[in-house]
Amino acid sequence: MPGGRNSTVITKFILVGFSDFPKLKLVLFVIFLGSYLSTVVWNLGLIILIRIDPYLHTPMYFFLSNLSFLDFCYISSTTPKMLSGFFQKSKSISFVGCTMQYFIFSSLGLSECCLLAAMAYDRYAAICNPLLYTAIMSPSLCVHMVVGAYSTGLLGSLIQLCAILQLHFCGPNIINHFFCDLPQLLVLSCSETFPLQVLKFVIAVIFGVASVIVILISYGYIIGTILNISSVEGRSKAFNTCASHLTAVTLFFGSGLFVYMRPSSNSSQGYDKMASVFYTVVIPMLNPLIYSLRNKEIKDALQRCKNKCFSQCHC
């Protein structure tokens, strides 16, 4: 009965995952396992490289190391459980485990929204105010911005968690997804979900749209500054500095807004699942490559690291 408790109270859920593709089970498992291991190695490797190379101890790479940390935690909050489900007969997850998985996942996602906005401001300061960059982006400000991103993400997720715990689940307990995400929980709830739908929309606007606005304003100033640079080489260097961040922002917010700015419905769950694969698995794997492949400073740091290891091995 909507809005009230039923005689049956759900204490666990069944995560369908990708069991509707039995013939592709092994192939999908190998793909997702490879993606997960690659993401872990690339993101942790980037964090270690930034940590050990003194030339990368700048605000830009401080933010990048935190982005890599978030991406590592982000994919680890969903993928291991999804991988274990490929070969488990019982694909169940407790109600507490389900809500905690969403809380962790949501906290990381919201924190990443804020961090990407902070990174855009850092690029604005570097390109539009190069002479004052060191003074503007002081170590204390960088730390405060990162701590603020984490804290704000935790707060936004905690508000959602409190609302989710007010829901009653008394009907079907099958989640047609590979992790516990809010749209799927709303579909299964036998309570009135409109208030939480509104909350979901408000959170998406505050974190998603507000972060995008900050990013757009920052890049508006950046583009204006780049157009005023006389040399082609200077323009190219400034643009390349921002291109990787713009790519990451487009991928992250594009896929996230596709899922979370739409009403929940059973008919859209197949699309949600595919979009979720993109922003929970693919994007965390691509981010370290996006920021590294055309980055001369990262390549130089890798070369210095190789030379140092080579010299130590031959001592």
Swiss-Prot record:
MF terms (GO), sorted A to Z: G protein-coupled receptor activity; olfactory receptor activity
Origin species: Mus musculus (Mouse)
Pfam families: 7tm_4 (PF13853)
Entries under InterPro entries matching the protein: GPCR_Rhodpsn, GPCR_Rhodpsn_7TM, Olfact_rcpt
Name this polypeptide is given: Olfactory receptor 5AN6
Segments traversing the membrane: 30-50, 55-75, 100-120, 124-143, 145-165, 203-223, 241-261, 273-293
Record-annotated disulphide pairs: 98-180
UniProtKB keywords: Cell membrane, Disulfide bond, G-protein coupled receptor, Membrane, Olfaction, Receptor, Sensory transduction, Transducer, Transmembrane, Transmembrane helix
Family note: Belongs to the G-protein coupled receptor 1 family.
UniProt topology in membrane: Multi-pass membrane protein
